[in-house]
Amino acid sequence: MILRRVFIAIGCVLFSPLSQANSSLGEVNIELRGNVVDFTCAVVAGDSNKSVNLGTWPTKQLHAAGDATQPVAFSLKLEGCPPGSASITFSGTPAPGTALLALADTAMAQKLAIEIRDGDQRRLPLEQASKAVDIDNNGNATLKFYANYIALADGVQPGLANADATFLINYN
């Protein structure tokens, strides 16, 4: 008899409108999305650990904030890509308050950063995808970029000016 009352009590609670009420307290909705592809692009062997020499520049070339050196062209060649287009997103440590690439060490040149530009020589901020390039019928694509030094403030101080960036291939 007691067992029967327990089942009735549990049934009343389970089917009660209060137990069915939606509460947003402590509720979190997460939506996960992605794609699975048959194959991905590969970076041509010589481009996977690319070194771009930006040259040696006098500080008078970088006298005032915003002054920049001559851009140096470089490209990233992809092969074995799926049909469509590809773009590149560069990542790295940003210079304070900018989307420019910070130098690798604070003991290096001062008040200086590295600007990455797209194939049209427009600034390409870190963490922003470049303009997409069509992949040819053989699955190849070449994406062209430029890089240069840029003064963050007046009075750039001399020294080594190296930085590291990584890139992500985006498929479109």
Curated annotation (Swiss-Prot):
It comes from the Bacteria. Pfam families: Fimbrial. Keywords: Disulfide bond, Fimbrium, Signal. Residues 1-21 form the signal peptide. It is found in: Fimbrium. Disulfide bonds join 41-81. One of its GO terms (biological process) is cell adhesion involved in single-species biofilm formation. Its main location: other. InterPro entries: Adhesion_dom_fimbrial, Adhesion_dom_fimbrial_sf, Adhesion_dom_sf, Bact_Fimbrial_Adh_Pro. Belongs to the fimbrial protein family. This is Fimbrial-like protein FimF. It comes from Salmonella typhimurium (strain LT2 / SGSC1412 / ATCC 700720). The lineage of its organism: Bacteria, Pseudomonadati, Pseudomonadota, Gammaproteobacteria, Enterobacterales.
